[in-house]
Swiss-Prot record:
Cofactor(s) demanded: NAD(+); NADP(+); FAD
Protein name: Zeta-carotene desaturase
Enzyme superclass (EC): oxidoreductase
Gene3D superfamilies assigned: FAD/NAD(P)-binding domain
Function: Catalyzes the conversion of zeta-carotene to lycopene via the intermediary of neurosporene.
Length: 489
């Protein structure tokens, strides 16, 4: 069977791996000049690796880890200390420290009860809310708890948290930075389902809250091994190939896709296959679907109710080590990297999470004779979309120095700003109902992408899981697809 996949992000590539392993022929068509989708990265003219986000691998990314192991990329992950670190104004560090003698759920209870990010009043309120949450049920009935959590999609996390005895202090100091890091929106705007899904996994599984980051850039250490695995098995990648139109035919009342009209910048051609997968993000799928499908099928019309959130990713290079707060000599020398080697959160800046990539992912980001390369995610990104890159860089620099007063005498030597007006889908309350399944009303047309139905959030894991589910839907209908192709010949 021949399958054409539109989109070479993680969802598209995960779909391809499953299909190729089952013995099928796959081609991927990507409109951009690089693969990877929202996890994509590239090298600029000066040799700097540029990313569109800060990519952290939680221990509960089981599907992504399985994919990475299969293609030989799992060894490219660097394990971080089992603690979630918050940097507050003035350089005060707060932690959710999951390191403990025993595993889940006790390490999680210890982390939240002893966190230095919250004062005593906030910790008590936080404990009350968590103690009355579905997370407790999940310790003995994981599937039942997950069903309860799915039903909480109708309300925001803040609404749920406050109704259970939580307080505003906990939301502001701890939960908002985490929500921004996960979904690019705060706890008043993110679904309770989204947040509680993550923390259900954290509570039930010791490894779920462990953090890892890539050895270097996503292109070199994640996408390249997947691409090589697929190409070694006959898969073809076509970048700069934009789908202009989906061709269809109605036979005996059934609509089927008969081809894709694709432009490569030089010529337009028609690609045919037995099955077609649209592995797009939300704006991509809205642009791809034929307009008449909206009126003909409510399944497709629901997709247009999904919205996205803007985000800006900023990289700042320094002439010293910004997160080394204790030793001035180490901070200013450039012979060795020093500082906080982990994902960092903050509630005191316009960026919710950040990391020094020269420490966390040194293969492509550490440069001899240079210092920190901070990568920071500005959320919500709305205020920055019309601002100049230079203004954004210096605005962020000022906030970095407020978090790290010890770095006041360090200089920014280079910056990059990447804006995405439409990034993750907005996981607002009530939106789960509009997420489509991977199988569609059109028998030979399938969807993949982290916005589609899958039991996780919009993330690298969600994208990978959606791709696996799309492939499973195709394989489950293989006989029907091949019969239809023979009948049309």
């Amino acid at each position: 069977m021949r399958v054409a996949i539109v989109g070479a992000g993680l969802a598209g590539m995960a779909t391809a791996v499953e299909l190729v392993d089952a013995g099928h022929e796959v081609e991927l068509y990507e409109a951009r000049s690089f693969i990877g989708g929202k996890v994509g990265s590239w090298v600029d003219g000066d040799g700097n690796h540029i990313e569109m986000g800060l990519h952290v691998f939680f221990g509960c990314y089981y599907n992504l880890f399985n994919l990475m192991e299969k293609v030989g990329a799992k060894q490219n992950l660097r394990l971080k200390e089992h603690t979630h670190t918050f940097v507050n104004q003035g350089g005060r560090i707060g932690e959710l420290d999951f390191r403990f003698l025993t595993g889940a759920p006790f390490n999680g209870l210890k982390a939240f009860f002893t966190t230095s990010q919250l004062d005593t009043k906030d910790k008590i309120a936080n404990s009350i809310a968590l103690a009355t949450s579905p997370i407790v049920r999940g310790l003995v009935d994981f599937d039942g708890a997950m069903k309860t959590i799915r039903d909480l999609d109708r309300i925001s996390f803040a609404e749920w948290f406050l109704s259970k005895g939580g307080n505003e202090g906990s939301l502001k100091k701890m939960w908002d930075p985490i929500a921004y890091a996960l979904g690019f929106i705060d706890t008043e705007n993110i679904s309770a389902r989204c947040m509680l899904t993550i923390f259900q996994l954290f509570a039930a599984r010791t490894e779920a809250s462990v953090l890892r980051m890539l050895e270097g850039s996503p292109q070199e250490y994640l996408h390249k091994p997947i691409q090589e695995y697929l190409e070694q098995r006959g898969t073809k990648f076509y970048t700069r190939h934009k789908v202009k139109e989906i061709k269809t035919k109605v036979t005996d009342g059934e609509t089927r896709v008969t081809g894709l009209i694709i432009n490569d910048g030089v010529e337009t051609k028609t690609v045919t296959a037995d099955a077609y997968v649209a592995a797009c993000d939300v704006p991509g799928i809205k642009n791809l679907l034929p307009e008449n499908w909206r009126t003909q099928w409510d399944f497709f019309n629901k997709i247009y109710y999904l919205d996205t959130v803007p985000v800006a990713t900023v990289q700042l290079r320094f002439d010293g080590w910004v997160t080394e707060m204790n030793d001035p000599a180490k901070r200013k020398q450039l012979e060795q990297a020093f500082g906080l080697d982990n994902l960092l959160y903050t509630s005191d800046a316009e960026f919710s999470c950040f990391a020094d990539l020269a420490l966390t992912s040194p293969a492509d980001y550490y440069r001899p004779g240079e210092g920190s390369l901070l990568q920071l995610v500005l959320t919500p990104g709305d205020p920055f979309m019309k601002e100049s890159n230079e203004a954004i860089a210096y605005r962020v620099l000022k906030q970095v120095k407020a978090l790290f007063p010890s770095a006041a005498d360090l200089n920014m030597t280079w910056y990059s700003v990447i804006k995405l007006a439409q990034s993750l889908y907005r996981e607002a309350p009530g939106m789960d109902l509009f997420r489509p399944s991977q199988a569609t009303p059109i028998a030979n047309f399938f969807l993949a992408g982290s916005y589609t139905q899958q039991d996780y959030i919009d993330s690298m894991e969600g994208a990978t899981l959606s791709g696996r589910q799309a492939a499973q839907a195709i394989l489950a209908n293989q006989a029907r697809l091949q019969t239809a192709v023979l009948a049309s010949q």
